[in-house]
């Protein structure tokens, strides 16, 4: 798209508005060298978006939705800089039709998410949470034995890890898991032939000690783990989800954990974020064999620094006409 480098297209400095700065966790996006006006808001309600972006050429967003009606009300907008890999909050077709560029950041959190997955593998198999609690609540100091049998402990080496999804993060998890002595397999799509290098969907469910989800949320994958597919899993198996919350029917997972069929879960994402009071994800968090983290797998210092720098580069390059 043609635009004047560093200007609003009328010779004036570009107006850049960050609508949800709080999603950067205090990390600063580098500002461009080109003349500009920079405005920041920690959080923006849907009803505030149009007013705050009035006259802006650049919008910086993470979770703020930008639909066609919103874009129609912003004739000056030229760039939406998304501080994430996914751009599902933007109606990309509507943006393209209006000549608005959408630039995101791909691959910044691959190491961070993969390490979070491996952390969950260790924490669940080694009983990290219940063992810590046995010290804090006085069971160790008040007992007669030299140790506390607070939870079952399983060696990770020799377990099968089933991965659903085969992108960069899944491959990074696979490499780390193999280094720990795990048998790593990739699942094919549900109801389809497995394909080269993969096992059938149902076979991975039935034979894996741990499964980890690394696929996008689509109509096909929504609630891919439900009462029926959970019943196919190996008794006592563990489930990890650092991808999208709605990949799992959490009510069905809760029932499977309650029955003992599923041995544990590590979950970093929820269908609605932040979760609503009393929601299934918060009920699960109270269980001793479940670890819930608040969508934190991506936010290592190195990952967020890279995200901030590359978002700044996206803006600077756009203003420079690149």
Name each model feature, range by range.
Residues 51-52, 70-73, 203-204, 229, ...:
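Structural alpha-helical scaffold elements that stabilize or flank donor/cofactor-binding regions
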Residues 1-56, 185:
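N-terminal glycine-/charge-rich "phosphate-binding" loop or analogous flexible N-terminal tail
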Residues 65-77, 220-239:
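Rossmann-fold NAD(P) dinucleotide-binding segment
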Residues 11-12, 147-235:
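Rossmann-like dinucleotide/phosphate-binding beta-alpha-beta segment
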Residues 236, 242-322:
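Rossmann-like dinucleotide-binding domain for NAD(H)/NADP(H)
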Residues 42, 62, 83-84, 100-111, ...:
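Short beta->alpha connector loops at strand-helix junctions that form conserved
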Residues 98, 106-160:
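Phosphate-binding beta-alpha-beta segment of Rossmann-like dinucleotide-binding domains, i.e.
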Residues 56, 74, 207-208:
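An anion/phosphate-binding loop that grips the pyrophosphate of nucleotide cofactors and donors
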């Amino acid at each position: 798209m043609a635009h004047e480098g560093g200007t609003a297209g009328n010779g004036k400095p570009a107006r850049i508005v960050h609508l949800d700065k709080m999603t950067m966790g205090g990390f600063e996006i580098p500002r461009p060298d080109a003349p500009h006006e920079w405005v920041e808001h920690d959080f923006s309600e849907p009803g505030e978006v149009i007013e705050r972006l009035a006259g802006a050429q650049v919008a910086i967003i993470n979770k703020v939705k930008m639909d066609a009606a919103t874009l129609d009300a912003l004739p000056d907008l030229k760039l939406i800089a998304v501080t994430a890999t996914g751009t599902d909050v933007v109606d990309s077709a509507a943006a393209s039709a209006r000549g608005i560029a959408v630039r995101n950041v791909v691959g910044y959190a691959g190491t961070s998410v993969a390490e979070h997955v491996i952390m969950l593998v260790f924490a669940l198999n080694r009983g990290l949470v219940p063992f810590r609690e046995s010290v804090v609540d006085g069971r160790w100091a008040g007992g007669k034995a030299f140790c506390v049998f607070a939870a079952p402990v399983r060696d990770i080496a020799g377990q099968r890890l089933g991965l659903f999804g085969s992108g960069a993060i899944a491959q990074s998890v696979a490499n780390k898991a193999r280094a720990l002595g795990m048998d790593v397999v990739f699942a094919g799509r549900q109801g389809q032939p497995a394909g080269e290098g993969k096992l059938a969907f149902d076979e991975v469910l039935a034979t894996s000690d741990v499964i980890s989800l690394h696929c996008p949320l689509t109509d096909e994958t929504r609630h891919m783990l439900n009462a029926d597919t959970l019943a196919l899993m190996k008794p006592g198996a563990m489930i990890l989800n650092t991808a999208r919350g709605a990949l799992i029917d959490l009510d069905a997972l809760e029932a499977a954990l309650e029955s003992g069929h599923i041995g544990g879960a590590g979950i970093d994402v929820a269908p609605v974020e932040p979760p609503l009071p009393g929601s299934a994800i918060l009920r699960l968090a109270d269980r001793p064999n479940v670890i819930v983290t608040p969508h934190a797998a991506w936010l290592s210092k190195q990952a967020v620094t890279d995200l901030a720098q590359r978002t700044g580069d996206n803006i600077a390059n756009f203003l420079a006409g690149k």
